[in-house]
Swiss-Prot record:
Lineage: superkingdom: Eukaryota
A single BP term in Gene Ontology: photosynthesis
Membrane topology term: Peripheral membrane protein
Protein family (similarity comment): Belongs to the Ycf3 family.
GO CC terms of this entry: chloroplast thylakoid membrane
Family annotation (SUPFAM superfamilies): TPR-like (SSF48452)
Originating species: Anthoceros angustus
UniProt keyword list: Chloroplast, Membrane, Photosynthesis, Plastid, Repeat, Thylakoid, TPR repeat
TPR repeat intervals: 35-68, 72-105, 120-153
InterPro entries: PSI_Ycf3_assembly, TPR-like_helical_dom_sf, TPR_rpt
Subcellular location: Plastid, Chloroplast thylakoid membrane
Coiled coil among keywords: no
Protein's name in the database: Photosystem I assembly protein Ycf3
Pfam families: TPR_1
Length: 170
């Protein structure tokens, strides 16, 4: 039984019912339906902190899904899991892959900026101001791109860009 059919949460159950109805109404192939089921089960597992199970579902969804736009969200969610696990290099790889398929993912750019900013903070703690500036400049570039896609979002990032003098778009 798919994970999404085991949910006790009212919202998850409602989403599952609506998604199942849509899958029956909208003309899709069996492969697309299976990919979506794995994606949905991955999201459910991820929301419960069951990252290994979520990754298994996302990898299976990736195997089945052929649409680049849909694949971008699967890759983005895989990146989120790696970010949560502190595997920042892996997370960045998945965010890059997601953006290659869908350049309109400000949330991926934001997460990449957060990782770069974190690495800049680490460089400060290690007494390496040159490396810090490189990471902060990279974070600024990602945040500027994210903000250009979603101007009313990322207020803290906008403030950081202004405070640090990095708000000018190159």
């Amino acid at each position: 039984m798919p994970r999404s059919q085991k949910n006790d949460n009212f919202i998850d159950k409602t989403f599952t019912i609506i998604a199942d109805i849509l899958l029956q109404i909208i003309p899709t192939t069996q492969r697309e339906k299976e990919a979506f089921t794995h994606y949905r089960d991955g999201m459910s597992a991820q929301s419960e902190g069951e990252y290994a199970e979520a990754l298994q579902n996302y990898y299976e969804a990736m195997r089945l899904e052929i649409d680049p736009y849909d694949r971008s969200y699967i890759l983005y969610n895989i990146g989120l899991i790696h970010t949560s696990n502190g595997e920042h290099a892996k997370a960045l790889e998945y965010y890059f892959q997601a953006l290659e398929r869908n350049s309109s993912l400000p949330q991926a750019l934001n997460n990449m900026a957060v990782i770069c900013h974190y690495r800049g903070e680490q460089a400060i703690e290690e007494g390496d101001p040159e490396t810090c500036e490189v990471w902060f400049d990279q974070a600024a570039d990602y945040w500027k791109k994210a903000i250009s896609l979603a101007p009313s979002n990322y207020i803290e990032a906008q403030n950081w860009l202004r405070i640090t003098g990095r708000s000018k778009i190159k």
